[in-house]
């Protein structure tokens, strides 16, 4: 049906205000499972150290009645190990005239962008801590680097035939990746048994998104069903968030920022993020018609005793 001639419509009008929602939708992931589950502490040097120790092997030798002590057990010294701090930062520069304008979804552009940088920085830190990266002392032209999980876990592992564990298990060298293969329940059981034998009690199985779905399909996980009344919606459970092994219960945690090819079995009590400088915002010198700032943190990974943890490595990523 045609409109009456000379009807003035919204297609002709020039003064209609735009309709822009006062909400900004951002679903970028920012969960950081490793940082959320392990502790944090402060350090006072770019190289921070700690000590590890272990008990002597079990001795079943019987002692004769009234026997004198003529020899003594050997005493092993503690092992001193350490890691370097790692500086991560995010920067921004925002023109001054932005705050003179009517902005949708935020009142202050710089504050909004700084909040974003903080979330981005936490994601960066998560990727560094879970990486297969050896520690580096750095110098005036090369940045220091902290050793990630991949450079620490060496005692309790399951890897491909051509993969190798870090030789020093002190963060000074990274593992060598091998041929990728499918994650299986037997691999997880193997590492849990190794950790138990070593004295560890991992409670978290941290995997990438693909291998989270693989864990949910383990044959050892019993099918779960709810009774479905005819007049109610039915819930179908297709995921595993807890895995009960012969040597303890594991909380299955997906991590978007770790390497998909690694599966970590962790005891949160034996790892922490050490901060020389915690995450903080710094306003930079103003040199023009704009505000400059950065969000910065200096931190390192402390693995109190790597034998408390384990890993399944060289996994397929799709």
Regions found by a protein language model. Give the residues of each.
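Flexible, glycine/threonine- and acidic-rich loop/arm segments that mediate assembly and lattice contacts
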Residues: 1-318
């Amino acid at each position: 049906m045609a409109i009456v001639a000379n009807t003035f419509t919204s297609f002709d009008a020039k003064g209609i205000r735009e309709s822009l929602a006062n909400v900004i939708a951002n679903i970028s992931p920012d969960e950081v499972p490793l940082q959320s589950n392990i502790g944090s502490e402060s350090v006072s040097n770019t190289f921070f150290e700690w000590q590890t120790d272990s008990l002597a092997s079990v001795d079943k030798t019987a002692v004769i009645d009234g026997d004198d002590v003529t020899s003594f057990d050997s005493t092993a010294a503690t092992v001193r190990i350490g890691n370097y701090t790692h500086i991560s930062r995010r920067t921004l520069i925002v023109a001054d005239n932005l705050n003179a304008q009517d902005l949708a979804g935020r009142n202050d552009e710089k504050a909004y962008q700084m909040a974003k940088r903080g979330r981005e920085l936490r994601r960066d830190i998560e990727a560094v801590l879970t990486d297969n990266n050896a520690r580096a002392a750095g110098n005036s032209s090369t940045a220091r680097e902290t050793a990630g999980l991949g450079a620490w876990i060496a005692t309790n592992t399951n890897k491909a035939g051509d993969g190798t564990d870090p030789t020093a298990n002190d963060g000074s060298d990274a593992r060598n990746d091998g041929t990728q293969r499918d994650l299986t329940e037997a691999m997880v059981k193997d590492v849990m048994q190794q950790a138990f034998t070593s004295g560890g009690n991992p409670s978290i199985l941290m995997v990438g998104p693909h291998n989270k779905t693989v864990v949910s399909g383990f044959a050892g996980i019993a099918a779960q069903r709810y009774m479905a009344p005819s007049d109610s919606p039915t819930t179908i459970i297709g995921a595993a968030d807890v895995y009960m092994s012969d040597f303890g219960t594991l909380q299955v945690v997906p991590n978007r920022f770790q390497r998909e090819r690694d599966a970590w079995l962790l005891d949160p009590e034996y790892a922490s993020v050490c901060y020389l400088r915690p995450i903080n915002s710094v306003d930079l010198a103003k040199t023009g018609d704009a505000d400059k700032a950065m969000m910065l943190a200096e931190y390192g990974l402390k693995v109190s005793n790597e034998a408390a943890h384990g890993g399944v490595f060289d996994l397929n990523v799709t």
